[in-house]
Amino acid sequence: MSEVVVKEQLEQYLSKIERLEQEKADLSEEIKDIFQDASSHGFDVKAMKTVLKLKKLDKDKLAEQDAMLELYRDTLGI
């Protein structure tokens, strides 16, 4: 590859990354705004974030985590 082609490819990659980083920042700001809105309507943001994490787990992993949590809570009497 010629130096010109390599330079152009590098610039394209960097440009795409910069664009995606900006989109990611914009999305993060939108998510923050949604959580603030939910909070102002009485929703517990911490609980919402926990639910979002749990939704990402498959059913077997979630059941395993729930069982372990229940075991620990029973052991500690909470």
From Swiss-Prot:
Pfam families: GapR_DNA-bd (PF10073). InterPro entries: GapR-like, GapR-like_DNA-bd. Transmembrane segments: none annotated. Belongs to the UPF0335 family. GO terms for molecular function: DNA binding. This is UPF0335 protein RBE_1185. It comes from the Bacteria. The lineage of its organism: Bacteria, Pseudomonadati, Pseudomonadota, Alphaproteobacteria, Rickettsiales.
